[in-house]
From Swiss-Prot:
It is found in: Secreted, Extracellular space, Apoplast. Pectin methylesterase (PME) inhibitor that inhibits PME in vitro. GO terms for molecular function: pectinesterase inhibitor activity. Keywords: Apoplast, Disulfide bond, Secreted, Signal. Induction: Induced by drought and salt stresses. SUPFAM superfamilies: Plant invertase/pectin methylesterase inhibitor. The keyword Secreted applies. The gene is PMEI8. Belongs to the PMEI family. This is Pectinesterase inhibitor 8. It comes from the Eukaryota. The lineage of its organism: Eukaryota, Viridiplantae, Streptophyta, Embryophyta, Tracheophyta. It comes from Oryza sativa subsp. japonica (Rice). Residues 1-30 form the signal peptide. Disulfide bonds join 36-51, 107-147.
Length: 183
């Protein structure tokens, strides 16, 4: 009987150690703050304040581990792209013919495609195909930059969608950096 009683504390201690190791290695308990801090340490392009602000407001963030927060970043990218496409189309209503109008039309198309790229990144990360997810996030950033390029080519400076482009690129960087943290 004494032998059995002495095994219980050892078994309980072993269970605690296993639980702690699994929690740390799986990212359980990750918060936007800790994930964004780690992402910023990994990639100096990560805007910590932006990262925390955008990820903290997502409904999936409170229960997410690092993998979940990578998906949250991709989903936030989908939302930002959708808002940017809406903004481009709204500005298009008031635009006169010419370079600015053509650039707005081009940007509306690019932002629609960017939303699809972020959605594909989400799906890839969800399937744990991290390289493909990061590639799609990079594609989304490239599409956003092409919007600014459309305005530059039209001789319109600054771009009336400069903020939307900047936020799109920032969330693509965040998505990639957090995905890099997933083990």
């Amino acid at each position: 009987m004494a032998q059995r009683a002495s095994r219980r504390p050892a078994a309980a201690a072993a269970a605690v150690v296993v639980a702690v190791v699994l929690a740390v290695s799986g990212g359980v308990g990750a918060t936007p703050e800790t994930a964004c801090r780690a992402a910023a340490e990994e990639d100096r392009r990560v805007d910590y304040e932006f990262c925390v602000s955008r990820l903290s407001h997502h409904h999936d963030s409170p229960d997410a581990d690092t993998w979940g927060l990578a998906k949250v970043a991709a989903d936030v990218g989908v939302c930002i792209a959708g808002d940017a496409a809406y903004d481009a189309k709204a500005k298009l209503q008031a635009a006169k013919a010419g370079g600015e109008r053509e650039a707005l039309e081009r940007c509306a198309e690019l932002y629609d495609r960017m939303g699809s790229a972020f959605a594909a990144a989400y799906d890839d990360i969800n399937r744990r195909e991290y390289a493909a997810g990061k590639e799609k996030a990079g594609e989304a950033a490239s599409l956003a930059r092409r919007c600014d390029g459309a305005f530059a080519d039209a001789g319109v400076a600054p771009s009336p969608l400069e903020r939307q482009t900047a936020e799109s690129v920032k969330i693509a960087i965040v998505c990639t950096a957090i995905t890099n943290l997933v083990k």
